[in-house]
């Protein structure tokens, strides 16, 4: 039997603390070489603004096997009343290959993306960080706020986006209530950056939206949005001045304009990347080494994140009797 799990089921079963813990283990396993994760297969349809990806992974130690199909269609909300990001995840039995669960992957994508930033923040941000800033207030920003609050002892979170002030205020009010942390609107991206100890960028920008002169010493940056070649959120000088940690170096070189563009400009080399988050977790390389350096976690999103979280959701669903059983063989 296959367990069918909808968005509400996933939301009830996958908390941010659990997601961060399972992702820490997944990144460590990838670094240790006990996970298989082929390059994602991507299809782009510019005629409809569509980005389609198929992302398989097998974490041998964790026993998680599966694949995610995810799409990003920018016109969905306005034209069809659908989310921009739509995903579905298959979880398979590692011994038989049988699909044991099919679940909504849209919400899970937001949670796991935030959780990765949370794990990176745990390892790379200054321990005395008290103010975080999030640039972007779309659906994917929700998980980022939750993860930052979980990862650091924050007194305040600043938010800024190009959306209207009422939408930003609604976002701030909602998450102030959920987290118990003061969430306020910044007047500009620059004012947010200058005040924050931790900054997460989660936008669909095509050109840099921050300037290297804005960062104060010791800032930790999570560069999460604009994860495609040729587009970026960060200017070249920011990448040059930061200690760069990737979710996976080769994936960032292949897909992240934030890294790819400086390399193509001839002012940054792949060897300048400090390493992968899993290597920091496993103690193979140093993370933050002093309170003055600027650290940058660049993430394009990996299948190990989806499949490890989905496997956890499936196990918890079985324990709690959540979901609908369905027999595909009838």
Q: What are the language-model segments listed below?
A:
Residues 1-110, 118, 128, 275, ...:
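N-terminal ligand-binding/catalytic initiation module
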Residues 7-9, 231-330:
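Adenosine-phosphate binding glycine-rich loop
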Residues 95-105, 158, 183, 289-294:
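Glycine/charged-rich beta-loop-alpha catalytic/anionic-binding loops adjacent to active sites
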Residues 116-117, 139-146, 174, 181-187, ...:
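Active-site glycine-rich loop that binds ribose-phosphate moieties when present
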Residues 117, 125-151, 160-164:
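Glycine-rich adenosine-cofactor-binding loop
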Residues 131, 155-156, 182:
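Residues at the starts of beta-strands that form the adenosine-phosphate
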Residues 150-178:
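NAD(P)-binding Rossmann-fold cofactor-contacting core
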Residues 180-267:
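Rossmann-like adenosine-cofactor binding region
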């Amino acid at each position: 039997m296959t367990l069918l799990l909808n968005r509400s089921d996933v939301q009830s079963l996958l908390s941010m603390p659990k997601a961060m813990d399972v992702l820490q283990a997944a990144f460590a396993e990838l670094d240790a070489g006990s996970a298989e994760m082929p390059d994602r297969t991507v299809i782009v349809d510019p005629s409809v603004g569509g980005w389609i990806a198929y992302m398989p992974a097998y974490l041998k130690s964790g026993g998680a096997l599966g694949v995610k199909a995810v799409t990003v269609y920018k016109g969905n909300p306005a034209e069809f009343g659908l989310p921009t990001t739509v995903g579905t995840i298959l979880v398979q039995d590692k011994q038989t290959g049988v699909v044991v669960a099919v679940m909504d992957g849209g919400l899970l994508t937001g949670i796991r993306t935030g959780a990765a930033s949370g794990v990176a923040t745990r390892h790379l941000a200054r321990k005395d960080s008290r103010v975080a800033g999030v640039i972007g207030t779309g659906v994917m920003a929700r998980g980022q706020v939750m993860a930052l609050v979980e990862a650091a002892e924050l007194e305040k979170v600043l938010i800024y986006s190009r959306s209207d002030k009422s939408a930003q205020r609604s976002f701030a009010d909602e998450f102030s209530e959920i987290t118990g942390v003061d969430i306020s609107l910044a007047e500009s991206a620059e004012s947010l950056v200058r005040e924050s100890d931790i900054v997460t960028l989660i936008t669909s920008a095509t050109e840099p939206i921050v300037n290297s002169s804005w960062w104060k010493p010791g800032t930790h940056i999570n560069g999460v949005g604009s994860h495609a070649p040729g587009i970026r959120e960060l200017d070249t000088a920011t990448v040059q001045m930061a200690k760069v940690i990737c979710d996976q170096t080769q994936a960032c070189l292949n897909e992240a304009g934030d890294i790819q563009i400086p390399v193509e400009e001839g002012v940054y080399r792949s060897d300048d990347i400090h390493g992968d988050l899993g290597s920091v977790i496993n103690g193979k390389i140093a993370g933050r080494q002093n309170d003055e350096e600027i650290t940058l976690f660049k993430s394009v999103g990996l299948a190990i994140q989806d499949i490890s979280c989905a496997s956890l959701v499936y196990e918890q669903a079985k324990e709690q009797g959540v979901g609908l059983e369905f027999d595909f063989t009838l």
